[in-house]
Amino acid sequence: MRGILCLLYNPPVPTHPFDRYAAFTDLSVLKAASDRPLRKSVRVNTLKCSVADFKAWAQEQGWSLTPVPWWPEGFYVDRTDLSTALGRDLRHLLGHFYMQEAASMLPVALLDPAPGEAILDLCAAPGSKTTQIAARIGLRTKDLGLKDLKHAPLASDDACLGVVIANDMQEKRLRVLNDALQRTGATSVVITRKVGQWFSKHLTERFDRVVCDAPCTAQGTARKDPTALQYSSQDSIEKAARLQYQLLEAAIHAAKVGGRIVYSTCTLTPEENEGVVLQILNKFSDQLEVIHPKEALPSGLNWDTSAAISDSEIVQKSLNPNPNPNLHPFLRLWPQTYDTEGFFCAVLKKTKPTRAVEPLEMFPRAARLLSRKNAEAVSRLFTEQFGTDFLQDDECLVEKGNFILLAGEKAHAFPLPVTEYAMGIPFAKILPDGRYRITNELASLRGHLASSHVLELMEEQLHGLLAGKDIPVDSALRGDTILRHRGISLGVGLSKEGTLLNRLPRWVVKLGS
């Protein structure tokens, strides 16, 4: 099949990487669209902020919001005041919203994850899709109501906080991923560092849903990075397609029977998109079905997918020698069609086993469950100090090094034949004398629950803290103090003898630089 695809799609050597697409779309329109600046778009992080609150706040800022049609928490943003970069906005740095290209929200929309499920993000860094999944499965049943879910979880137990296994290979990218998860308050995520193909054998049929947003030649990102087209040699394309095939196959093996797999790239080449999926369907013709995007998307969305499906069908015809080929409802987003990056998605359902399931070889966990005695001590301390222990029913405390971590129970209990790279968010730091100190990550996520040891900041105090300064406070205020401004929890400081020592995280303090 691979050889057939290469022979069928053999355009002349182009002078521009897009010239090879002349048979698929209007080149002048494609090139003009790719030269236009990319529209700014954001996704509301519902772990920290409701869509209604975000929209009200954005209106106060004078922002104009246009909904992203395929994700209810996604918005295009138009601002008249451009004096502050969107990425330096305080709410962004605190994780209330995430800067994410609109097309990049589509794979998780098609995945349509639900609370209680086990999800694999096979190529997770830098974290946009992982944080998007974590926010969706972090919505409790009591918040959503099962009647509001398009599907009940495939998992046997009821819809509580699920688990996301976020995998990547590169250390630098993993650090960026971990920072994003801590900033957004994603307690349900376990990070692993493995080649994607490892999941085929070691975690066969373990996941309700798998997203494979594969490494690619990234032609679709030319609107924000013109240098992306430098990596479009035929050798680069074919090398990427070989890896993508292996990763998609691993994703299929890792999915449970009945599970959903979403394959996506941010490139335009047929070899890396339709070509890869058609090869997979040829190999697993009896074990896979293609799901129509309309069936895959969350309920209540009325996005018209017909143009994207039609554009993919045109490409599929070029890859198939049959005069009447069986065409599949894949999604091809040319930059000009929806005014986005170039993107591709396909949704598959696993209907039968694809390989034998082998016994799990378990490894000791790097983070161990906190003893009942210590967990009660932390809970008692925080309740006395802040009026709440900040815990929810389906969460647990685990100990790793000199930190106590807050994690979903499913995240900690998920059987992994590997030592996790990271899990949950920092809950408390264990001081040398054995005392516990609340973390900025916890204060930012749950500080709104506190009823004592809270300082409501005035504008002048806020500006001083963001500039990295300590500020004067009432001498009656002592110890760890949660800092809030207009209902938003920023982090913590230490009140001592009439001074609040600034202990805000580096990504917040940098606002004042």
Can you say where each PLM-predicted feature lies in the sequence?
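Conserved AdoMet
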Residues: 43-105
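C-terminal catalytic and target-recognition region of SAM-dependent MTase-like enzymes
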Residues: 70, 267-399, 491, 506
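S-adenosyl-L-methionine
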Residues: 169-202
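Helix-to-beta-strand junctions that scaffold the AdoMet/dcAdoMet cofactor pocket
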Residues: 255-256
